[in-house]
C-alpha cells in the first residue's frame, strides 16, 4: 500500500490540472501564435510561468486505483501488475485467464 499522503497529493494535482486546463491551453495558444506581437507572447509566457507547478499535466503520476502503487501500472485497467494478478487469480477480471504451456 502506498502512503495516503502520496495518493492524496496526486489526487490534488489531478484536481488542479482539471481546474487550470482551459487557462493553460489559452496561454499556450497565445505563445504559439506567431502573428501576435512579441510583447503579448512574452507576457503570456510569464503568466504561464507564474501558474502553480502542480497545475501541469506532466506532474500527475499514474497510480493503481486499488493499492496506490506508482510503478508498473497498466493504463487500460488503471491497476498495477500485482493487483491484476490478484484479481485475475480470483476470477474477478472477465476474459483474463492464467497462461500455461
Curated annotation (Swiss-Prot):
Residues 12-22 have a biased composition (Basic residues). Residues 1-22 are annotated as: Disordered. The keyword Cytoplasm does not apply. InterPro entries: Ribosomal_uS14, Ribosomal_uS14_bac/plastid. GO terms for cellular component: cytoplasm; small ribosomal subunit. Pfam families: Ribosomal_S14. GO terms for molecular function: rRNA binding; structural constituent of ribosome. Residues 1-11 have a biased composition (Basic and acidic residues). Disulfide bonds: none annotated. GO terms for biological process: translation. Keywords: Ribonucleoprotein, Ribosomal protein, RNA-binding, rRNA-binding. Part of the 30S ribosomal subunit. Contacts proteins S3 and S10. Binds 16S rRNA, required for the assembly of 30S particles and may also be responsible for determining the conformation of the 16S rRNA at the A site. Belongs to the universal ribosomal protein uS14 family. This is Small ribosomal subunit protein uS14. It comes from Afipia carboxidovorans (strain ATCC 49405 / DSM 1227 / KCTC 32145 / OM5) (Oligotropha carboxidovorans). The lineage of its organism: Bacteria, Pseudomonadati, Pseudomonadota, Alphaproteobacteria, Hyphomicrobiales. The gene is rpsN.
